[in-house]
Each structure stands twice: as structure tokens, then as C-alpha cells.
Amino acid sequence: DLRMSRGLGDVYKRQILSHDHFQGGHYEFAMAKAPIEKKWVFPGFEDVDAGIVHWPMSCIRLICADDERLVELADQILTAWRGYTDESCFVYAETDGEPHNTITPIARMRDGKFQLDLVLRNNLTTPEHPLGVYHPHAKLHHIKKENIGLIEVMGLAVLPSRLKQELFDLADLLVARAPTAGYPEALQKHAEWAQDILDRHPELNADNVHLILQDEVGHVFAEVLADAGVYKMDTAGRAGFVRFLESVK
């Protein structure tokens, strides 16, 4: 069912395609360290090293000493992606006249060459996923419900401030092995997750609970990035990614 949901979902749909800003800084994010898992040669751009980055969000990396060639190829990829549909991967360029595809670009200089990471984005929504098919899904909203921006795309979790106190309170309940049914209302959204943590960490105690929670939040954030990735890191997803690359002319 490709009927677009309304309300809050519309806010997120508009944001991903119209939220324009430039952000700079001197910090090496995890995505910048991720290797290329599959090299690719774009016809007519044999001088540009390219490939699929080993990252949960769908990222194409371009490397070239000539920045103009890099921009020329990036523009070609963006144009192709804006008009690209692959129903087998649930990728639609538009529905009901509304466009869905865009790119988040990240540029850096490394070893005397320009690098440009192009992260494929799609803001399609459905009744099942009213905030976005490629957005954190409902089971993760107790940790992260907000939109996935540039910083998160590169691997640094920007989490809601409410979590700071909630995780401290949750730590006390975990150490006490308190029944999840008795959790206060503000922590009920974490109950299922908390029980799963206890089941997998019988060693949890007052000394290690905060480290365990930090690690578990990290695992949730990895799932957030996986949800936001258009092409999943499995055989079908990577095959779909290659089909798109083949379409870039």
C-alpha cells in the first residue's frame, strides 16, 4: 500500500528533501573509516575511484584528485537517483507526484585526494511506517524516534536528552531485578528491551550496569542506521544497490 500517510510523517518527508545546510568540522567519524566493500567503475569516469562503502546506510564513495570530475560524477549519480525506482527493493522515485529520493553528501580531503561520500536517502512512508520506511522503526523509538541527520549518518548517535535520566533510573531497576510490569510509566517504553538485556546479561550488577547499557544503546543505534539504509547489507540488498549503480549513465 503506497498511499502516503499524513500528519507527522509529512513533516519528516518534507525535511529530508528540503532541509538544506552546510556543516563542517575536523573530526573523523566512523563512516569515514569504513572500507570500500565493492569497487565500481562508472563509464566515462575511469579516473575516479569508486565503490560501495561497508556501512549500514547506503553509501557510494568517490575519490579523485580533480574536484571538478568528482562533482560532475556526483551530479550524475544524484540525477539518476532522483528518478530511480526499483519495486523489488521498495524504492520509488515518487508516489502521487511527490518525490522521495535524495542524497546526503559528505566531503573530505585524504592523502592529497578529494573524497566524496554519497549516502542514498528515501523518505517514502506507509501506514505501517508513518515516519518513514527508511527511518528508525517503531520498536526502536524508545531510544531514537527523531530524524536521522548528517551526524548520525556518519555514525555518531544524537540521542534525546530524556535518555540521560531514564537510563540512570533504568540501571537501578536492572540491578534490583525489578519486575518490568512494575516499572514507572516513564520507563515502560524500555520494559521489553530491559528484560531482553537481563536475559542476555546474567552477570549484570551495580559495577557493570552502566557499561552494559552504553553498549546496548550502541546496538540499538546500529539497528537505527540499518533501518535508515535503503539497500540492506544482505544479498538482496547489495544486488539492488548494484542495479542502481548499473543504471548511472
Language-model regions: role of each:
Residues D1-L8, Y12:
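Single conserved hydrophobic/aromatic residue that forms the stacking wall/gate
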Residues R3, M109-D111:
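Extended, composition-driven regions rather than compact fold-specific motifs
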Residues D10-S18, T95-T102:
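Beta-rich nucleic-acid/ligand-interaction surfaces
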Residues K13-F29, V119:
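Histidine-centered divalent-metal-coordination microenvironment in nucleic-acid enzymes
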Residues G25-V48:
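Helical (often loop-to-helix) elements that flank the catalytic cores of nucleotide-handling enzymes
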Residues G51-E87:
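A conserved active-site cap/scaffold subdomain adjacent to cofactor or substrate pockets
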Residues A74-I106:
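Active-site/ligand-binding surface loops and adjacent short beta/alpha elements
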Residues G112-K249:
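Sequence termini and other peripheral, non-core segments
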